[in-house]
């Protein structure tokens, strides 16, 4: 039995666990990209809560009323102490609604990029959903669909 508590926020993950998360994140990215190739993003529904998530996003972060905000992720800003404090309440509102709401997911930095190591960042699933739902609503992912 452990005599000290483990701080999950600061604990170092075993390499195997990190690899499993990375594999899942890549699989999810490949599936999402395939969906975008088959159907315009503006026609996709990612969850049954898309309308609520989008409305909550623009109410919580009014800058998302401008499609340009959804087109680019400022990783430094998002992952700063101020950014984390702003996003945390948004994420937590979906803890009991969206499965794996905090699971690590790959998000494209720019909506004009494909999924590549240099063009993606690792974020909680709810941040991915917030950005991608907004991108889809604004038609920013429609270019991906193959004819």
From Swiss-Prot:
InterPro entries: PBDC1-like_dom_sf, PBDC1_metazoa/fungi, Polysacc_synth_dom. Keywords: Cytoplasm, Nucleus. It is found in: Cytoplasm; Nucleus. Disulfide bonds: none annotated. The keyword Signal does not apply. Pfam families: PBDC1 (PF04669). GO terms for cellular component: cytosol; nucleus. The keyword Membrane does not apply. Belongs to the PBDC1 family. This is Protein PBDC1 homolog. The lineage of its organism: Eukaryota, Fungi, Dikarya, Ascomycota, Taphrinomycotina.
């Amino acid at each position: 039995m452990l005599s000290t508590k483990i701080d999950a926020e600061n604990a170092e993950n075993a390499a195997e666990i990190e690899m499993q998360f990375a594999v899942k994140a890549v699989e999810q990215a490949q599936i999402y990209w395939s969906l975008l190739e088959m159907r315009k993003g503006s026609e996709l529904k990612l969850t049954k809560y898309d309308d609520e998530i989008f409305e909550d996003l623009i109410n919580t972060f009014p800058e998302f009323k401008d499609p340009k905000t959804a087109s680019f992720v400022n990783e430094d800003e998002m992952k700063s102490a101020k950014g984390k404090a702003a996003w945390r309440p948004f994420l937590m509102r979906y803890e009991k609604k969206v499965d794996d709401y905090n699971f690590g997911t790959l998000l494209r930095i720019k909506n004009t990029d494909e999924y590549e190591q240099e063009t993606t960042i690792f974020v909680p699933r709810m941040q991915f959903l917030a950005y991608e739902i907004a991108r889809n609503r604004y038609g920013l992912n429609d270019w991906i669909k193959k004819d």
